[in-house]
Curated annotation (Swiss-Prot):
Residues 47-571 are virion surface. Belongs to the paramyxoviruses hemagglutinin-neuraminidase family. It is found in: Virion membrane; Host cell membrane. The gene is HN. The chain crosses the membrane at residues 26-46. It comes from the Viruses. It comes from Human parainfluenza 2 virus (HPIV-2). This is Hemagglutinin-neuraminidase.
Length: 571
């Protein structure tokens, strides 16, 4: 039987797309050249002496065929443009769905043989394959998206079963074939460094009998081997999941105070239940970074690389510290005037990256980049963001949406609104020297925080506060010009609607300048923490759904329980 274990699902539609697009474009250009040549030939060979200037009738008789030819040329060009821009992409999506479905049938039907495959192929319901990691409404959309009622789905996230300890730090990744999910199971209390185990699962989206999606768990592994993995981030890759964690042996504050880097681990979990873990060593980090932490939010698989969001502390006086210490990013709120001169505000913004509580380390965001060509690689690189384009280092999430790269950064510093960036770095030429990002201007949504960096803070100050609450862009957030607010930009998620306390979890949709629709729970004092949101579309019904994962306070079993909420989003 043929071995499908090395079959790359992504390569099929991409290769098909390139061939069809290039062929159509070349044919269109050739047609235009031929028609233009024909018209020019007709013009050049006009017999001017035969009476072109003699009478209006003769002029009209000569010009009219040219006009008709030009009309035909324009009509043909419009048809080619319509075919290339609309018809062909739709057909590609249809072909792609058929290919995925056929492959799934081969792996799950009579042709499947577990002795020569990496396990049964995981694949979402066909109605969802082409509705994932796409912009879900048009860029020109400027309406008010609203949430439908909570949908009663079976939870794919196991809860704590003991009053001691808690479950925390969810990370969720979704690609065209399957999803991956992980969280930390803290055994004694709910402190970051307490002894813990790690839960990791993968599964698929299925259509329920009630005509809405459910998340079916297909594979799970519970890592209870005595290794205290923390701050784990997950990424779905072809064939399975990748888990990136650091091993905690001391508190976060102690991690920043020392120069002895904690152990970093990269684990691969495949369809056939194979689990392979590597300890990774990053070049040019020892002696420069005090600590390196996975940034909790999910990573991405892009152009043969696995990318994870990272943050940590740079040691003063090192080359990395010196390179970044003069850089700072200072977004502006148009309706808020900050005290002090511009130079004073700039100085405050620059100093906001260095945190006294964390032994005066410079808090830095970065991306861990690992080639997937060696699927069990321990060869990874850490590439820093340019601090003149992003805020102080913090937890975050990476996205690939319509082949564009984006980055959410937790608002842990003085800017209280959600931080979302377009990544402009080109990975097609290999690992870059630095990550370039462009801020998506937005003054929503707030997060709770301590003074002087509470929920209404937009002026430079030195603090470390806030809470992780990633966003999901519903349409293209690209501004019309540099740092110009896009009035049509819409995004969704959940936030903690309180000035300073981690309470009152609330679902929202927002524009760059206003909350558009909010719905919460009856108890506005209910405790909560991290939130993570992922929206997608059923391309058959055209319905949009948002999966919103929230760490909800629990008074019975542990301090927190992680709950997945599913709602339809109505544009």
């Amino acid at each position: 039987m043929e071995d499908y274990s090395n079959l790359s699902l992504k390569s099929i539609p991409k290769r098909t797309c390139r061939i069809i697009f290039r062929t159509a474009t070349i044919l269109g250009i050739c047609t235009l050249i031929v028609l233009c040549s024909s018209i020019l030939h007709e013009i050049i060979h006009l017999d001017v002496s035969s009476g072109l200037m003699d009478s209006d009738d003769s002029q009209q008789g000569i010009i009219q065929p040219i006009i008709e030819s030009l009309k035909s040329l324009i009509a043909l060009a419009n048809q080619i443009l319509y075919n290339v821009a609309i018809i062909i992409p739709l057909k590609i999506d249809s072909i792609e769905t058929v290919i995925y479905s056929a492959l799934k049938d081969m792996h799950t039907g009579s042709m499947s043989n577990t002795n020569c495959t990496p396990g049964n192929l995981l694949l979402h319901d066909a109605a969802y394959i082409n509705g994932l990691n796409k912009f879900l409404v048009l860029k020109s959309y400027n309406g008010t998206p609203k949430y439908g009622p909570l949908l009663n789905i079976p939870s794919f996230i196991p809860s704590a079963t003991s009053p001691n300890g808690c479950t925390r730090i969810p990370s969720f990744s979704l690609i065209k074939t399957h999803w991956c999910y992980t969280h930390n199971v803290i055994l004694g209390d709910c402190l970051d460094f307490t002894t813990s185990n790690q839960y990791l699962a993968m599964g698929i989206i299925q259509q329920s009998a009630a005509a809405f999606p459910i998340f079916r768990t297909m594979k799970t592994i519970y890592l209870s081997d005595g290794i205290n993995r923390k701050s784990c981030s997950v990424t779905a890759i072809p064939g399975g999941c990748v888990l990136y964690c650091y091993v905690a042996t001391r508190s976060e504050k102690e991690d920043y105070a020392t120069t002895d880097l904690a152990e970093l681990r990269l684990a691969f979990y495949y369809y056939n239940d194979t689990f392979i873990e590597r300890v990774i060593s990053l070049p040019n980090t020892t002696g420069q970074w005090a600590t390196i932490n996975p940034a909790v939010g999910s990573g991405i698989y892009h152009l043969g690389f696995i990318l994870f969001p990272v943050y940590g502390g740079l040691i003063k006086g090192t080359p990395s510290y010196n390179k970044q210490s003069s850089r700072y990013f200072i977004p502006k709120h148009p309706n808020i005037t900050c005290a002090g001169k511009s130079s004073e505000q700039a100085a405050a913004a620059r100093s906001s990256y260095v945190i006294r509580y964390h032994s005066n380390r410079l808090l830095q965001s970065a991306v861990l980049i690992c080639p997937l060509s060696d699927m069990h690689t321990a060869r990874c690189n850490l590439v820093m963001f340019n601090n003149s384009q992003v805020m102080m280092g913090a937890e975050g999430r990476l996205y690939v949406i319509d082949n564009n790269l984006y980055y959410y950064q937790r608002s842990s510093s003085w800017w209280s609104a959600s931080l979302f960036y377009r990544i402009n770095t080109d990975f097609s030429k290999g690992i870059p020297p630095i990550i370039e990002a462009q801020w998506v201007p937005s003054y929503q949504v707030p997060r709770p925080g301590v003074m002087p960096c509470n929920a209404t803070s937009f002026c430079p100050a030195n603090c470390i506060t806030g809470v992780y609450a990633d966003v999901w862009p519903l349409n293209d957030p690209e501004p019309t010009s540099q740092n110009a607010l896009n009035p049509n930009y819409r995004f969704a998620g959940a936030f903690l609607r309180n000035e300073s306390n981690r309470t009152n979890p609330t679902f929202y949709t927002a524009s760059a300048s206003a909350l558009l629709n909010t719905t919460g729970f009856n108890n506005t004092n209910h405790k909560a923490a991290y939130t993570s949101s992922t929206c997608f579309k059923n391309t058959g019904t055209q319905k949009i759904y948002c999966l919103i994962i929230i760490e909800m306070g629990s008074s019975l079993l542990g301090e927190f329980q992680i709950i997945p909420f599913l709602r339809e989003l109505i544009p």
